[in-house]
C-alpha cells in the first residue's frame, strides 16, 4: 500500500481511481462499510482504491479543547487499511490551508488522483466549516461527471455506530459492546517507559 502524507508531494496524475473519503478516526464497522463499498466499485471498474483521511482529528485545529481520545493509532489504522485491500492511503495533516478551502477547491485538490467515484457516509461534510454536504457533492458529481455513492449510517442493534459512541462505551467499561461496533477487539498500543523497576523487588512486577 502506497502512503501519501503531503498533497504537495504529489506531482504526477494517478491512474483512474475511486476514493473513500472520511475522518475514519475509529475505523469501525460504519467506516469499513464505506471503504468496502469503494473497494467493490474499484474491483468492478478496474480502478485503484484510495482512502483519503487525515493524520490528525479536524477538531485539533478547529476546537483543540474538544479533541476526542484516540481509539486507534496511526500504525493500527495503516495495518487495518492494508487488510482491507487499499492501494493508496492519503493520510495528510488537517491544517489551515485545507480547512480554508471551499468545497469546490477541496475537490480540485483531489483531481490529481484522477477519481471516477467518491464514496462517503451520509453525514459527510467537506470544505470550509463543513459547508459542503452530501447533496452538494451529488450536484458536483452530476455536473463534473463522476459517480457519488452515499452510504447510510450502520447500526448495531438499534444504535447508530459512531466513534463518539464507541469512546463512551469504552470509558464506561463496556468493551465487548464497543468491540461489536468496531468489528475487532479494541486495543491501543504504545511504548512502555521503564521506571526504577522496584515492583519486582517486592514481588509485584509492573508493566514498566
Regions found by a protein language model. Name each.
Residues 1-208:
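Nucleotidyltransferase catalytic core that binds NTPs
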Amino acid at each position: 500500500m502506497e502512503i501519501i502524507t503531503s498533497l504537495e508531494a504529489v506531482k504526477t496524475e494517478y491512474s483512474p481511481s475511486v476514493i473513500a473519503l472520511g475522518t475514519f478516526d475509529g475505523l469501525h464497522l460504519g467506516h469499513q462499510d464505506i471503504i468496502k463499498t469503494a473497494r467493490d466499485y474499484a474491483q468492478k471498474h478496474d480502478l485503484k482504491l484510495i482512502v483519503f483521511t487525515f493524520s490528525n482529528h479536524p477538531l485539533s485545529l478547529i476546537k483543540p479543547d474538544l479533541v476526542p481520545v484516540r481509539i486507534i493509532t496511526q500504525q493500527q489504522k495503516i495495518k487495518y487499511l492494508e487488510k482491507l485491500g487499499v492501494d493508496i492511503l492519503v493520510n495528510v495533516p488537517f491544517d489551515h490551508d485545507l480547512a480554508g478551502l471551499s468545497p469546490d477547491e477541496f475537490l480540485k485538490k483531489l483531481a490529481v488522483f484522477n477519481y471516477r467515484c467518491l464514496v462517503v457516509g451520509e453525514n459527510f461534510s467537506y470544505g470550509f466549516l463543513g459547508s459542503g454536504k452530501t447533496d452538494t457533492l451529488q450536484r458536483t458529481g452530476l455536473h463534473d461527471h463522476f459517480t457519488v455513492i452515499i452510504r447510510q449510517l450502520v447500526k448495531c442493534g438499534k444504535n447508530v455506530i459512531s466513534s463518539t459512541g464507541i469512546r463512551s462505551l469504552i470509558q464506561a467499561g463496556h468493551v465487548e459492546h464497543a468491540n461489536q461496533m468496531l468489528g475487532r477487539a479494541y486495543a491501543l498500543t504504545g511504548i512502555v517507559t521503564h521506571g526504577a523497576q522496584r515492583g519486582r523487588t517486592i514481588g509485584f512486577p509492573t508493566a514498566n
